[in-house]
Amino acid sequence: MESSRGKPGLNGSGGGAAAFDYSSRRGYYTGAGAALPPLAAGSRAPPVDPCCVALRVFVLLGTLASAVVMAADRQSTTVQIAAGEQLAPPLRVPVTAKWTYSSAFVYFVVANAMVFAFSAAALAAVRRRSAVVPVMVGDLVAMALLFSAVGAAAQFGLLGERGNAHVRWAKVCDVYGPFCERAMAAVVVALIAAFADLVLLMLTILTIHKASSYY
């Protein structure tokens, strides 16, 4: 009967016809009826994109520079405080600004140090096929850490630069000028590193998408 005939290319009848290998999860196309054995796990290293490596090196160096600059940021100066009596000379009081005095700056240093450590580990595992997905997930977490740390540090820096008239918080960057400049420089470098990590994550996703046999 007509219904009992096998369909060429699906059950092996019809020699020379194009066929698919359904023995593996991906079903590799052979084009000649012969099954193509799937690659063994870890049998071949994934291709390395030089652009991705360059971006990761930039993130590594950028987060290191941001963490070091912020952690070394310290300034001691002297401010004048007017005495109660008009004829009395103003009092000269020594004051010090350090990054540890701000929880936003502490979080900034810790986040950059964590991203630096992850970037170094990711560079060491760049040739391992089994590390592609864990590194991609780590890049997502690192990007979130960087953007949140940059936002917190930038908000505190703007508060020191401009103050807040609504709650009568005076600006302090006119007193601690070099301290604020170094802190904002570290924030800018970390922001650029965060965008570089974003581009790196997008390129990694595109590379995996192109290399996948599903599409």
UniProtKB/Swiss-Prot annotation:
One of its GO terms (cellular component) is plasma membrane. It is a multi-pass membrane protein. Its main location: membrane. Residues 73-103, 152-185 are extracellular. Disulfide bonds: none annotated. It is found in: Cell membrane. Keywords: Cell membrane, Membrane, Transmembrane, Transmembrane helix. Homodimer and heterodimers. PANTHER family: CASP-LIKE PROTEIN 1U1. Belongs to the Casparian strip membrane proteins (CASP) family. This is CASP-like protein 1E1. The lineage of its organism: Eukaryota, Viridiplantae, Streptophyta, Embryophyta, Tracheophyta.
